[in-house]
Regions:
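An acidic, low-aromatic, low-complexity terminal/linker signal
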Residues: 1-176
């Protein structure tokens, strides 16, 4: 039996050693993802209900609906619309649904939930909205849904665009 374990002794100076320090992240947590045309976007994590990887046959097509709608999905007893986010933003490249799984980001505001199908999920990152710039070289079809963009490299060739989930949810494009 040990009478004085090492963790009970000491002056408490260990807590100030650099390897024990936890850096607090700057900014807000965002989900990064790609559309079929390989453009990278982000959504604020607080507005995301969940991210789902599912088989395309779980999305029920709706006849005579807008081409940007892939169909509906039963999400824990709630039926939600699922859209090809790239086409919703005006991209001509449609999402390939002939694959084993599709990534769907379920966004929510108040009681409204919509699924946004994307090509690939990039991960979660802490991003500082204070460094957000005005979007440049964007199509008119995408402009109403952007809050801004971050330039990711010094050449300003690679950007990450922040989407406005409220504008997406309230868009008249859902009407067809």
């Amino acid at each position: 039996m040990v009478s004085k374990p090492d963790f009970f002794v000491g002056s408490g100076e260990d807590q100030f050693r650099p390897e024990f320090q936890v850096e607090s992240p700057e900014g807000e947590l965002h989900l990064r993802f790609f559309t079929p045309s390989h453009q990278e976007f982000a959504l604020l994590a607080t507005g995301i209900r969940e991210v789902i990887e599912l088989s395309p046959d779980r999305i029920t097509p709706i006849p005579n609906a807008s081409p940007l709608l892939l169909g509906t999905l039963n999400l824990r007893g709630r039926v939600i619309w699922v859209a090809d986010l790239g086409q919703f933003l005006g991209d001509v490249t449609s999402l390939n649904t002939d694959r084993a799984e599709i990534q769907v980001i379920a966004i929510e505001e108040q009681e409204t939930i919509v699924g946004l199908a994307v090509e690939e999920i990039g991960g979660m990152d802490w991003l500082d909205v204070q460094h957000l710039g005005n979007p440049t070289n964007i199509p008119d079809t995408m402009a109403p849904f952007l809050r801004g963009e971050w330039m990711l490299d010094a050449d300003k060739t690679q950007c990450l665009r922040l989407l406005d989930q409220t504008a997406i949810l309230r868009s008249a494009r859902w009407a067809g």
